[in-house]
């Protein structure tokens, strides 16, 4: 079990209550530390509008090569990932044969990231067998994508106001971003 969290804001200077974004993402990560006590990491874009946080429980790749957030070899994509891809070795072998990949480590996260870089997000998701939740930042398009497995086994909570967006493996992480949480009844009915 790992923990993921992050946020996007249109006003990068300060978050609610006049806190710095670095302070906020660190607080968000600390609330989910029990999900991944081995290591934590943060990523933010050049404009300081997007922040990704990860709490790591090392299982597949115990080295620092499995650290997250992780950025693709091409530099276009950055990801925080929680879960397991059961068929990652098959996908890794296929990418190695086709593209002669030089892998940094042995994590399923790196395999997912490079698969997305190679075939695109939609095509990559079709190939996956596993349980997972992730946030993927596309640096070229300046877009954030959230994804979960078909059955939603791994938790992923979201908060959105139109100018601010936050997510986390637990609501506690989002509570560090805002004091203004409420349930959207239409989303619950979906």
Name every feature range the model reports, one short phrase each.
Residues 1-190:
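Cysteine-centered catalytic environments shared across enzyme families
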């Amino acid at each position: 079990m790992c923990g993921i969290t992050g946020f996007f804001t249109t006003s990068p200077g300060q978050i609610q209550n006049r806190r710095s974004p670095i302070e906020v993402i660190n607080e968000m990560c600390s609330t989910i530390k029990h999900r991944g006590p081995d290591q934590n990491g943060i990523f933010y874009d050049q404009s300081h509008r997007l922040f990704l946080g990860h709490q790591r429980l090392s299982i597949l790749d115990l080295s620092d090569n499995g650290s997250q957030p992780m950025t693709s070899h091409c530099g276009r994509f950055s990801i925080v990932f929680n879960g397991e891809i059961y068929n990652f070795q098959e996908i890794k072998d296929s990418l190695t044969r086709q593209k002669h990949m030089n892998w940094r480590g042995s994590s399923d996260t790196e395999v997912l990231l490079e698969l997305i870089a190679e075939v695109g997000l939609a095509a990559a998701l079709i190939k996956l067998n596993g349980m997972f939740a992730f946030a993927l930042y596309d640096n070229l398009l300046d877009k954030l994508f959230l994804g979960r497995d078909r059955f939603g086994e791994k938790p992923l909570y979201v908060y959105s106001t139109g100018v601010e967006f936050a997510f986390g493996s637990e609501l506690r992480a989002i509570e560090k971003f805002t004091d203004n949480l409420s349930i959207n009844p239409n989303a619950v009915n979906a």
